[in-house]
């Protein structure tokens, strides 16, 4: 991995919330030639298929070994750096890992593009909103409006 790619990767893992989401949205827009959304309830629009597109991504990090508490909070922060936790795709069967895709409101889009930023590659998946309820790990109980 050259220095520019490593710097980009490290930046992806450092971005938070809206800025992280914007990078993912721009990437999917460019890859699939989607246009801007028609309203604030989905991220992009597929003019060819006439579908509302939702885009959700997460970084993939090795699972934390301990729950944070008063006695280990500082130590846990020191161990939380990218070098210790970023997971390569080739390691996904060797370690438990954390990735979190939230606020999936099935009724507001037709197709979901969701992706995982590993340390060495990006995995992109596609699912129709009608398939989400049967997706392993999906919960519609986290946020109001997810039903």
Which residue stretches match the model-derived regions?
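Nucleic-acid endonuclease domains
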Residues: 1-51, 56-147
């Amino acid at each position: 991995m050259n220095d520019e790619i490593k710097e980009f990767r490290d930046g992806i893992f450092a971005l938070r919330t809206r800025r992280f989401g914007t990078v993912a949205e721009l990437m999917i827009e460019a890859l699939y030639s989607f246009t801007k959304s028609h309203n604030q309830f989905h991220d992009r629009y597929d003019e060819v298929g006439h579908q509302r597109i939702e885009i959700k991504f997460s970084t993939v990090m090795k699972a934390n070994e301990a729950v944070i508490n008063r006695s280990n909070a500082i130590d846990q922060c020191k161990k939380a750096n990218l070098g210790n936790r970023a997971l390569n795709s080739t390691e996904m069967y060797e370690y438990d890992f954390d990735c979190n895709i939230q606020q999936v409101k099935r009724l507001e889009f037709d197709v979901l593009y969701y992706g995982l930023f590993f340390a060495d590659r990006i995995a992109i998946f596609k699912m129709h909103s009608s398939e989400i309820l049967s997706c392993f790990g999906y919960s519609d109980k986290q946020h109001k409006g997810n039903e």
